[in-house]
Amino acid sequence: MSVLEPGCGMGYFTLPIARMTGPEGRVVAVDLQAKMIEGLVRRARRAGLLERIEAIVCDDSDLGFTDRAGLIDIALAIHVLHEVRDQQRFLEQVFDALRPGGRLLILEPKGHVPREKLDGELALAERVGFHRIAEAVHRRSHGALLEKPA
C-alpha cells in the first residue's frame, strides 16, 4: 500500500501509518518546512521505519510528487487543507497522484475551521473530480472521505 501524507510535520501520523502499511508499504510524507522533515527522518530512523518513508520538502506551489501520478492508494490531509494557499492546485496534485479508485481523507479541526469553510473545501474537491463517499466526524475534527473515480 502507498500512502501520501501532505503536511506531515514531524510525523505524528506518519510513523503509525508506516507501521500499518507493513514492510512492503510506502509513505510519501511531504512538508513545507525542512526542519519538520529533518525531525521526521530522525524519528523514523530511531523507530526503524525510515526504509518505508520517503520524506519530501516541498514548496507551496508544488508538492513535489508529480512523478508518482496514479501510484498512490490513499492520501491523508489531516488538519492541513485550511493552511494551503492554493487549495485547488493542492487538490489537483493529490488527485493526479492517486490511482483510479484511490481515496483522500480530509479532516479539519472543528475549533479552527467552521463547517461552512469545510463545505467549501469539499465542494472544491468535488470540482477537481473527487466523489464524496462518506462523512468523517471525530470529537475535534470533521471532514470527508473522497474517492478518485475508477
What name fits each language-model region?
Residues 49-60:
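Conserved SAM-binding strand-loop segment of SAM-dependent methyltransferases
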Residues 101-108:
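Conserved beta-strand signature within the Rossmann-like core of class I S-adenosyl-L-methionine
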